[in-house]
Amino acid sequence: MTNAISNFTIYAFVALGGACGASLRFYISQLVLNWLGKGFPFATLMVNIIGSFTMGLLYQLIEHEILNVSVHRTLIGIGFLGAFTTFSTFSLDSLLLLQQGDVLKAAINILLNVSLCIAAAALGMFMVTTLTK
């Protein structure tokens, strides 16, 4: 497949990736909620870490020309990860914790999401860079 793909194909990739990402996000969220409960937004944290790791992998796989930028950036980066990751949910979870007066949980949530997601993206990038040398 060439780098020039039709607009219809681009929208189809975004839609397909989005449907898969949203479905997997819901599935993982339910698993984590059943496992760890609702006392802390672990489900949001988990999908954000997985999504950040996957974005790091994707970025380096495209940079190393292992994946096609037009297809995989659209399907996975925009579609799948756009629906899978949950920055808006992370923001709401943090705000609700603050409104409930649970400043410590809110601070921990913010710290964990930011630090672990950046670390996960870096790990994904590092793995591809190391494996492609």
Curated annotation (Swiss-Prot):
GO cellular component: plasma membrane
Keyword list, A-Z: Cell inner membrane, Cell membrane, Ion channel, Ion transport, Membrane, Metal-binding, Sodium, Transmembrane, Transmembrane helix, Transport
GO biological process, one term: cellular detoxification of fluoride
Main localization category: membrane
UniProt GO molecular function: fluoride channel activity; metal ion binding
Protein location: Cell inner membrane
Its membrane topology: Multi-pass membrane protein
Family note: Belongs to the fluoride channel Fluc/FEX (TC 1.A.43) family.
Functional summary from the UniProt entry: Fluoride-specific ion channel. Important for reducing fluoride concentration in the cell, thus reducing its toxicity.
Identification of the protein by name: Fluoride-specific ion channel FluC
Organism name: Colwellia psychrerythraea (strain 34H / ATCC BAA-681)
Higher taxonomy: Bacteria, Pseudomonadati, Pseudomonadota, Gammaproteobacteria, Alteromonadales
